[in-house]
Amino acid sequence: MRNHVLAASISMLSLLAIMGDTDSKTDSSFLMDSQRCMRHHYVDSISHPLYKCSSKMVLLARCEGHCSQASRSEPLVSFSTVLKQPFRSSCHCCRPQTSKLKALRLRCSGGMRLTATYRYILSCHCEECSS
């Protein structure tokens, strides 16, 4: 009988621990948050397209995710027979907000060294898309 009470107490504590954890990563706000516009890191190999250089692995970042504003297009009303822009559109894109210039040197055949440059994304945000 004593073992059954202990097992029931442990089961109840486990249930409370599981129920108490529902506000963390299983919450729908977390799922929405994980899809928002944000910076994602990845590793890529950089090599020169023409010269025979040793490639280098580099940590890069990209902006990816959804913006909360809805996209839409609506017709423009005009009293002209020619409509240069028949629609007004609005949309928001996940784009880099801040970045910094980075460089790396590749060793090539014949002792030559080439410098590759790229922008490393520091932060991302939603902004109106350009046409």
Swiss-Prot record:
Tissue note: Expressed in the outer nuclear, inner nuclear and ganglion cell layers of the retina.
One Pfam family recorded for the sequence: DAN
Gene Ontology CC terms, in alphabetical order: cell surface; collagen-containing extracellular matrix; extracellular space
PROSITE patterns: CTCK_1, CTCK_2
Entry keywords, A to Z: Disulfide bond, Secreted, Signal, Wnt signaling pathway
Cellular compartments annotated: Secreted
Cysteine pairings via disulfide bonds: C37-C94, C53-C108, C63-C124, C67-C126
Location, primary (coarse class): secreted
One GO term (biological process): re-entry into mitotic cell cycle
Molecular function per GO: cytokine activity; frizzled binding; protein homodimerization activity
Extent of the signal sequence: 1-24
All copies of domain CTCK, residue ranges: 37-130
Keyword Signal: yes
Subunit structure: Homodimer; disulfide-linked. Component of a complex, at least composed of TSPAN12, FZD4, LRP5/6 and norrin (NDP). Binds FZD4 with high affinity. Interacts with LRP6 (via Beta-propellers 1 and 2).
Known role: Activates the canonical Wnt signaling pathway through FZD4 and LRP5 coreceptor. Plays a central role in retinal vascularization by acting as a ligand for FZD4 that signals via stabilizing beta-catenin (CTNNB1) and activating LEF/TCF-mediated transcriptional programs. Acts in concert with TSPAN12 to activate FZD4 independently of the Wnt-dependent activation of FZD4, suggesting the existence of a Wnt-independent signaling that also promote accumulation the beta-catenin (CTNNB1). May be involved in a pathway that regulates neural cell differentiation and proliferation.
PANTHER family: NORRIN
Protein's UniProt name: Norrin
Protein species of origin: Mus musculus (Mouse)
